[in-house]
Amino acid sequence: AKAVSKDVYQESEAGDWAENADGTGKWVRYDANGHMVKGWDTNNDGTYYFDQVYGTMAKGIVTIDGNLYLFDVDTGVMQASITTSEEAMADRVIELVNQERTSRGLQPLVKDDRLMVAAAARAKELSQRYSHTRPNGSECFTILWHLGIDYGYAGENIAMGQRTPEIVMNDWMNSSGHRANILNENYDCIGVGYTMVDGYPYWVQLFTGDFDL
């Protein structure tokens, strides 16, 4: 049976209306039998996650069973996930990036969870459109805006086909534009996305830095 989404409203003590009893505006979902959906739920619109206790819809960046997930902040549809194996590949890339930087006297970059899920989402998008332009036609950095990530400087490296972190880093370091991003002194944070789609690997590096005041 198709589940139905709706916002739950209860009258507050002040006499006005608040979304949910606690006023948080969280969404819940009920199945055709009127039971609150909890846990994972998939329908024609996509995949969602509802809190196992309160049934509230996950939005934004959420850790579930030790894995990071990105859910649309408006609709709650899952946009990306980072499995343990994918994160291990991404972490190795970050390690190699920082080896390149520190060997040249540059500061190492800090792994940022928000950039990690943004990069994971971008990696999946590359399987639809291999470009710095997203499948919806917007530029790659709109995913940062959507997640509320503030930055003064930003960069993106993309790649496809390389089977290991060492190979993709070698290719990036032998490309002047990609190398410039990896060694950019203005960046201080990094997120790396890696995914396999139909047996084909896609890679993304996202960098951000603040303006010096």
Where are these regions (language model features)?
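Extracellular adhesion/carbohydrate-binding repeat motifs centered on closely spaced tryptophans
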Residues: 1-88
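A short alpha-helix/helix-coil micro-patch that ends at or immediately precedes a cysteine
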Residues: 82-129
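A mature extracytoplasmic/lumenal domain signature
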Residues: 34, 54, 73-75, 113-115, ...
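Disulfide-stabilized extracellular recognition modules
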Residues: 159-213
